Amino acid sequence: LKKINEEFDFFNNSKIVTIDLFGHTPGSIGLLVNLDKNQFLIASDAVSLLRNLEFEEVPKNAWNKAELLKSYQKIKKLSQKKINLICGHDYLQWNQNFKLGIEYN
């Protein structure tokens, strides 16, 4: 088990990198996934709903408002690079953009 304090590159090839997204909880992290044709940021609870980021809404259960707003800015900066953001609890985002289960052909 490795304690992660800053960015951590799992395979030393930039394919999966953690980024700190403190605010929701003291040690919140996101996963930046770099594929050949797309990039994704799995934000987990750092951005529960896309509207939280768009309107800089801080959920009531956030540990530290100032840190969460810093994380929002970091995510917005990454989003300028056309990274696909995956929110932790946004049913509308998941329902409109992602498959919700396994599809068999």
Predicted feature residues:
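A generic structural motif
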Residues: P26, K37-N38
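Active-site-proximal beta-strand elements of phosphoester/diester hydrolases
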Residues: I16-F22, L41-S44
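Divalent-metal (often Zn2+) His-rich catalytic cores of metallo-beta-lactamase-fold enzymes
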Residues: D9-N12, V33, Q39, L50, ...
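Loop/turn-rich, solvent-exposed surfaces of beta-rich toroidal or solenoidal domains
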Residues: S28-G30
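Active-site metal-binding loops of divalent metal-dependent hydrolases
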Residues: H24-T25, D45-A46, H89-D90
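A hydrophobic, small-residue-rich beta->alpha segment in the mid-to-C-terminal subdomain
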Residues: A43-E67, S71
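Metallo-beta-lactamase
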Residues: L1-D20, W63-K82
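Short polar/acidic secondary-structure junctions
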Residues: F22-G23, N34
